[in-house]
Amino acid sequence: MAKQIQYLLISILAIIMLLPSCEEVKGTPEEFQKKRKTILVYMAANNNLSEDAKNNLADMQKGYIPEDDGNLVVYYHYPNQNPLLLNITHNETGAVAVDTIYRFPPRNSATASSLKSAINVTATYFPAEEYGLILWSHATGWLPVNYYATNPQRSLASDGSYPLDNMQQNSHTNPFQEYINGEDPYAEIVKMVKGNNNGILSRSFGSEEGSEIDIKELVNALPFKFSFMIFDACLMGGIEVAYQLKDSTDYLLFSPTETLANGMPYSLIMQHLFSNPTDLTATAKEYYNFYNSQTLLRYATVSVVKTSELENVATVAKEIFDTGRDKISSIDIKGIQQYFRNNKHWFYDIEDFIGKIATQEQAAKFNEAINKAVIYKAATPYFISIPINSEKFSGLSTYIPYFNESELDRYYKTLEWNSACGMIQ
């Protein structure tokens, strides 16, 4: 009787609360039949993005929800609660329902072990012929753990080399004032977490209590190959990330710049992700069109990569680095398309960069390889303070070993991309 009363109280509390924070576990793995596709959205939101996660979860409930052919599953870690595995579905009356399928013990979601556990539990409860994975949180591409925290950057105001965006140009006050004071005026609208006094903490993916998932750890956390992976996170659209993940997924959708904290328009994209076959190009177009139509926050970059073409990109790149590596130190780096703000000079356009050190014939061969790998790309004219030249936008970023950062160069040598192309010897 006591257990029945306890269960009743928990159920009542679950109904009252707006967030899906109930502790009830619904069903057992044996009750779930294998379907065509399962999509897991891994929302590591036990951080300053929690309200954005809440809004995105609500948006998912407004869009396409699969019936007999698929499962929409969300790993949801909101502050002050244990992570939950949620299934967005329809109940017996046809109304949208968010069922709590599994309640995880207290954990840090910005670890490889937590991600791997979430994927394995999802596969157990929601077996499918194919799986898609959306990684939602903070991110800073391929950089090693805590590199930002231990490597402060110069203020934008110290060199004045980067142009203002259209909003800043209309300001009657010093547009760099907040940078001079050590603050980023756009910190609240992008998926970037503030760190210590040195600047911003870095991570390949995820951020919680100072923990991050290194890109190499991320690969090891994926227990099987996904048909597609999407990063709703900053700066993941680089050749280093793509090449590291080439054996973990068939396709990637990500952004070479930062991403806005508002996230993807989930109510619009799910129909494309659950289509058969998955239409990542339509998904990317939906994302781009959504932000390109905005009046104030008209900022977005997006790329779709076919990972089976990346080996050829590396082969061609190696030929270029073998003959043009010595030219890197003398290139006009300010003339290369950048994808960073705040002088975080680790993300440049790969095609624009290669064109500076390759022969005309080599550059043409490389461009052909990139165009086969990047099957869709789009960018607004600006991403905040970064002008995006459509003729230079290849859809992929790269590191350029120009600033004599020995620690970063040593780490870069451990990445699969550098092992394949030999940019840094």
What are these language model-derived features?
Residues 77-101, 130, 134-206:
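Surface-exposed loop and adjacent secondary-structure segments within mature catalytic domains
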Residues 52-53, 84-85, 143-148, 241-242, ...:
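Short, solvent-exposed loop/turn and secondary-structure capping segments
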Residues 45-48, 78-82, 107, 137-143, ...:
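Solvent-exposed loop/turn segments at secondary-structure junctions
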Residues 49-84:
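N-terminal carbohydrate-binding/catalytic regions of secreted carbohydrate-active enzymes
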Residues 164-425:
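Terminal, contiguous helix-loop blocks that mediate binding/assembly
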Residues 1-9:
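Bacterial N-terminal signal peptides that target proteins for export
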Residues 36-38, 67-73, 126-132, 223-228, ...:
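Loop/turn elements at helix/coil->beta-strand transitions in domains of secreted/extracellular proteins
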Residues 1-2, 16-39:
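Bacterial Sec-dependent N-terminal signal peptides
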